[in-house]
UniProtKB/Swiss-Prot annotation:
Type II collagen is specific for cartilaginous tissues. It is essential for the normal embryonic development of the skeleton, for linear growth and for the ability of cartilage to resist compressive forces. This is Collagen alpha-1(II) chain. Residues 318-327, 339-360, 405-420, 429-438, 638-647 have a biased composition (Low complexity). Residues 318-360, 405-438, 638-669 are annotated as: Disordered. Transmembrane segments: none annotated. Keywords: Collagen, Extinct organism protein, Extracellular matrix, Hydroxylation, Repeat, Secreted. Belongs to the fibrillar collagen family. It comes from the Eukaryota. It is found in: Secreted, Extracellular space, Extracellular matrix. GO terms for cellular component: collagen trimer; extracellular region. The modification 3-hydroxyproline is found at residues 413, 650. These protein fragments were extracted from 160,000 to 600,000 year old bones. The tryptic peptides required multiple purification steps in order to eliminate contaminants and to increase the concentration of peptidic material. Homotrimers of alpha 1(II) chains. It comes from Mammut americanum.
């Protein structure tokens, strides 16, 4: 919710004890300048007027200029004007003003490098006036410049330290404070460390080092504005009062302000007020009194309000600026915001797992339905994994086809072998008993060409001669090609079954079996998938069929199931067209399932699994293969019966009536 409103303004603090009266009228002008700084308004014009007015006013203006410099570049230009006025001045107070102006120039240098060059010129003028001012300006330039310039300025600061130890310590403290105000990175911390080392070379380095450490801690406290104000206050106090105790007191006050970081703005105002008070005290030459007041402030620094009251007390009696009240208590939490809008829809889910293959018996019906459907149905079937897709599976397949761009999901384990279909109707009667096999083969080829699916299946099942089987395999291949062209799904399914039977009969010739299996696979693929995919599928199917033939001894039902499953898997893989290796793995898994269903040796299944692993199948594929082996535990169905013997032919029609015989010879008389 929205944060609560600001609490009511606290009551104004008690009036501080009246401070010592300032000696000169310039002090009165300084008081006015301090009031302007507290008001934080008319900064540039007031700063210029103060610079023209007096050195103490210039010191106060330095604090105001620091905040103003953070505010805008125009204030930096005003600071440069103040620096010029300081150069025009030529008294000890003017030297102090030059030091304050140097701090302002440091802010200006932070604003622009050209201003840094001007600050160097001002430093030269100040050097003509006083070496201490030059050291302060050099330290300011070091704070403003980069690390290398800081090192050079550090050397200059060392020379300044040789000139005046106390002034050098003050300059080092100012430099550390300025660096903290600049809020540079670790380089600034290193510069501060170098300044601390230079201060260590100085006599009264201990207090200065403590002040520098306090300034660094304040900077680390992330109160950048407060740190800048504290830095200006420290510089003004150090330049005005040569006593290290006063600097230490100022540092303690700054530390207290940093501790009370809750109200950064209030702390900055208090620091500015303290700086104005220190400047007024310096102008009044009552350094001891200022130190005592600062010590009292440090002692009473427990509460920020107390510190503000102390600062007010330190200020001239004429100013009597009321301190801002303590911040109000935290407002109650606002009511909860309205509920957010519904998020955007999630991304499409992964494609679902493939459905298990339906029973083989249903396959014929499904194929017929596919044939009844147009080529679109064939395309859907191509997407489907199983040759015998259920209606729901077909719908899922359509969805998958839409999302074909995604990687193909792993093929699900093949379903258990279906029961064999019912025996076909009896085949046509053979012409002659002797040549029955050959005649049957020829008839089968003719029937297949004629697309008499039932008769072809019966004849193929009836065929049993090995030599005839080879011929039949060739004929079946031709028939399969014709059927594929005709796109008769039922005939294709029958041809696949016939080819499986022929392969079982012709197990003796491995090559013939492989050819037959390949032809069957091609036919099944053509029936199940689009004709275009069949060409690509043929090679993979042939390899898969060869692997299957090698893996398991051919059993009629097992071979048929293996051929159908392999063809379906190969077709799906071809449709995916992503990884031929995956297709090979799927074919291997199908072969393993077929072997298990046929109750073949377990070793063969293990070998098939090993082959799949060797084929770089994914781990998921391997798991699927294991699951398929587990699921394939169902008993294999027995092969279908051969068709009944054909009915005897109808009796022939009765012959025509014979011609009348010749008249008999004449009888004897």
């Amino acid at each position: 919710g929205e944060p609560g409103g600001v609490g009511p303004i606290g009551p104004p603090g008690e009036r501080g004890a009246p401070g010592n009266r300032x000696x000169x009228x310039x002090x009165x002008x300084x008081x006015x300048x301090x009031x302007x700084x507290x008001x934080x308004x008319x900064x540039x014009x007031x700063x210029x007027x103060x610079x023209x007015x007096x050195x103490x006013x210039x010191x106060x203006x330095x604090x105001x200029x620091x905040x103003x410099x953070x505010x805008x570049x125009x204030x930096x230009x005003x600071x440069x004007x103040x620096x010029x006025x300081x150069x025009x001045x030529x008294x000890x107070x003017x030297x102090x003003x030059x030091x304050x102006x140097x701090x302002x120039x440091x802010x200006x240098x932070x604003x622009x490098x050209x201003x840094x060059x001007x600050x160097x010129x001002x430093x030269x003028x100040x050097x003509x006036x006083x070496x201490x001012x030059x050291x302060x300006x050099x330290x300011x330039x070091x704070x403003x410049x980069x690390x290398x310039x800081x090192x050079x300025x550090x050397x200059x600061x060392x020379x300044x330290x040789x000139x005046x130890x106390x002034x050098x310590x003050x300059x080092x403290x100012x430099x550390x404070x300025x660096x903290x105000x600049x809020x540079x990175x670790x380089x600034x911390x290193x510069x501060x460390x170098x300044x601390x080392x230079x201060x260590x070379x100085x006599x009264x380095x201990x207090x200065x080092x403590x002040x520098x450490x306090x300034x660094x801690x304040x900077x680390x406290x992330x109160x950048x504005x407060x740190x800048x104000x504290x830095x200006x206050x420290x510089x003004x106090x150090x330049x005005x009062x040569x006593x290290x105790x006063x600097x230490x007191x100022x540092x303690x006050x700054x530390x207290x302000x940093x501790x009370x970081x809750x109200x950064x703005x209030x702390x900055x105002x208090x620091x500015x007020x303290x700086x104005x008070x220190x400047x007024x005290x310096x102008x009044x030459x009552x350094x001891x009194x200022x130190x005592x007041x600062x010590x009292x402030x440090x002692x009473x620094x427990x509460x920020x309000x107390x510190x503000x009251x102390x600062x007010x007390x330190x200020x001239x009696x004429x100013x009597x600026x009321x301190x801002x009240g303590a911040p109000g208590e935290r407002g109650e939490t606002g009511p909860p915001g309205p509920a957010g809008f519904a998020g955007p829809p999630g991304a499409d889910g992964q494609p679902g797992a493939k459905x298990x293959x339906x029973x083989x018996x249903x396959x014929x019906x499904x194929x017929x339905x596919x044939x009844x459907x147009x080529x679109x149905x064939x395309x859907x079937x191509x997407x489907x994994x199983x040759x015998x897709x259920x209606x729901x599976x077909x719908x899922x397949x359509x969805x998958x086809x839409x999302x074909x761009x995604x990687x193909x999901x792993x093929v699900g384990p093949p379903g258990a072998n279906g029961n064999p279909g019912p025996a076909g109707p009896p085949g046509p009667a053979g012409k002659x008993x002797x040549x029955x096999x050959x005649x049957x083969x020829x008839x089968x080829x003719x029937x297949x060409x004629x697309x008499x699916x039932x008769x072809x299946x019966x004849x193929x099942x009836x065929x049993x001669x090995x030599x005839x089987x080879x011929x039949x395999x060739x004929x079946x291949x031709x028939x399969x090609x014709x059927x594929x062209x005709x796109x008769x799904x039922x005939x294709x399914x029958x041809x696949x079954x016939x080819x499986x039977x022929x392969x079982x009969x012709x197990x003796x010739x491995x090559x013939x079996x492989x050819x037959x299996x390949x032809x069957x696979x091609x036919x099944x693929x053509x029936x199940x998938x689009x004709x275009x995919x069949x060409x690509x599928x043929x090679x993979x199917x042939x390899x898969x069929x060869x692997x299957x033939x090698x893996x398991x001894x051919x059993x009629x039902x097992x071979x048929x199931x293996x051929x159908x499953x392999x063809x379906x898997x190969x077709x799906x893989x071809x449709x995916x067209x992503x990884x031929x290796x995956x297709x090979x793995x799927x074919x291997x898994x199908x072969x393993x399932x077929x072997x298990x269903x046929x109750x073949x040796x377990x070793x063969x299944x293990x070998x098939x699994x090993x082959x799949x692993x060797x084929x770089x199948x994914x781990x998921x594929x391997x798991x699927x293969x294991x699951x398929x082996x587990x699921x394939x535990x169902x008993x294999x169905x027995x092969x279908g019966f051969t068709g009944l013997q054909g009915l005897p032919g109808p009796p022939g029609t009765s012959g025509d009536q014979g011609a009348s015989g010749p008249s008999g010879p004449a009888g004897p008389r």
